[in-house]
Swiss-Prot record:
InterPro entries per the UniProt record, alphabetical: Hfq, LSM_dom_sf, Sm
Species classification: Bacteria, Pseudomonadati, Pseudomonadota, Gammaproteobacteria, Pseudomonadales
SUPFAM superfamilies from the UniProt entry: Sm-like ribonucleoproteins
One example of a Gene Ontology biological process annotation: regulation of RNA stability
Protein task: RNA chaperone that binds small regulatory RNA (sRNAs) and mRNAs to facilitate mRNA translational regulation in response to envelope stress, environmental stress and changes in metabolite concentrations. Also binds with high specificity to tRNAs.
Gene3D superfamilies in alphabetical order: 2.30.30.100
Protein name: RNA-binding protein Hfq
Sm domain boundaries: 9-68
Length: 86
């Protein structure tokens, strides 16, 4: 994973796994809403009544409908290890 994706991928993956609704604002001002079905390096599949493939270079902002908690770097590396048990 490249350094530029160290926040983007876990953020999008959390939104996908928890099926959090999102508003995606495009650079031209259009607002799309739905849930993230899948994503890769270049696109996000957004599902509402239909699935739309949205190119990441066209996205300005991704806004979840509720706050989400991202796993910390130590949690994702340590797996089941609990904080404070070093």
């Amino acid at each position: 994973m490249s350094k530029g994706h160290s926040l983007q991928d876990p953020y999008l993956n959390t939104l996908r796994k928890e099926k959090v609704g999102v508003s995606i604002y495009l650079v031209n001002g259009i607002k799309l809403q739905g849930t993230i079905e899948s994503f890769d390096q270049f696109v996000i599949l957004l599902k509402n009544t239909v699935s739309q493939m949205v190119y990441k270079h066209a996205i300005s902002t991704v806004v979840p409908v509720r706050p989400i908690r991202l796993p910390s770097a130590t949690e994702s590396e340590a797996g089941d290890a609990e904080p404070g048990n070093a």
